[in-house]
Amino acid sequence: MTGSMLKRLFAAAALLLAATLLSPAQTGTWSGELDVQGTRLPIVFHLDEENPTVDSPAQGARGIPVEVIRTSSGGVTIKVPSIGATYEGLWMIKRIVGTFRQMGASLPLTLTPGEEKLNRPQTPKGPFPYAQEEVSFSNGDAVLRGTLTLPEGYTRNTPALVMVTGSGLQNRDEEFFEHKPFAVIADALARSGIATLRYDDRGFGESTGDIVNCTTEDLKNDALAGIRLLRERFDKVGVIGHSEGGTIALMLAAEAKADFVVSLAGMVVSGKETLLWQNRVALTATGVPAETVDVYCKALSEVFDACMAGEPLPSVGGYGLTAALAQNLAAVSAQLQTPYLKYFIALDVRPLLGRISCPVLAFNGTKDMQVEPWSNLGALRDGLPDNARKQVEAIEGVNHLFQHSRTGMVDEYREIEETIAPEVLDKMVRWLLCCE
């Protein structure tokens, strides 16, 4: 499963258990972890009798209302009609043992009292030497709500940036396993005299909008609406984007909508190339034999090609894959029916780079296992005009989230206490101040 798709699974799983187990003996906070292909996804239930809720700290999804059906024998059935999910559990004195099901998939979940608190020392804590305003802006039917961070003594000449998250549903802080990288970046920039606008993704948090039929183009236009909001108050407006958000930043720069852009682990090569590389890395890391990896990636490439050509997708059973890999390929084929993934695999910003005339800062981590650093940075260096003001740099030893890491794999994100490498923040601030 790809990193991008895994994040979307996180988003779905954050809601998948959107129900609370409630009985007189089951009040307070209960938590457990889903094992999503080797990555732990914490789920936290707050068992208030009147307003039970569930949180998914990994996705920054909190306070989701839930409903529950109990039996006299200690069983519980939890239904989530909005996503077609059901959880069935059994009270076992000091734990609740159960299984959730959605779209034919089943995963075990055991809950125990309390909630694990993760140490995140870089998360900003007040009082702050800058102002924050809650704002909203619209793109068609989508209403985006977010936070405008304003440095002390700001004027129209203060540089300002729209912050665009990566793929998958995320809140304005781009929260992931209780890390809040966008909050950390906004804090660092505000302390250096730079304003930012960060917002909840459409259809998530406090924002509304269609997420079923949207594509990266729609997400780009959401960010463009944020640029328009900032231009009402600031003369110099740029974009800072992470992962898919970095791709969106480059798309906006090519359309001359931004005065400067920062791409953090942005995808420059095509979505197809990125997903194939992600799959190869993930399968190899889990010990799948090289020959099997080659066969699976060949099959995946042919599925992508057929989708982009508008042809019927190849039969999953024709590649001699193991049952698990055949099931995964079938799941990918099903997801290719969605507008988002159809658009994403064909997305390639390389032809757009020659149109960019504004300053560009691009970082990729050398241990990024979701967006391959060298091909993407190389494409930027080669594609941007020779006269463009550009800084394209590989940051040594950091992963896709720009944490210092051992392997760069997704399963380390939660365990690392650092949210973002200080040298990345420092380089970003110094570059932005030089753009003034």
Regions found by a protein language model. Give the residues of each.
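Short, surface-exposed "cap/lid" segments of acyl-processing enzymes
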Residues: 153-157, 161-188
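Central antiparallel beta-sheet cores of small beta-barrel/beta-sandwich binding domains
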Residues: 26-91, 97-102, 122
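Conserved alpha/beta-hydrolase
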Residues: 184-206
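Accessory cap/linker subdomain of secreted extracellular hydrolases
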Residues: 264-355
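Alpha/beta-hydrolase active-site loop
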Residues: 213-232
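Short beta-strand/loop motif that positions the catalytic acidic residue
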Residues: 356, 362-364
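N-terminal cap/lid segment of alpha/beta-hydrolase-fold proteins
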Residues: 116-156
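Conserved alpha/beta-hydrolase "acid-adjacent" motif
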Residues: 369-375
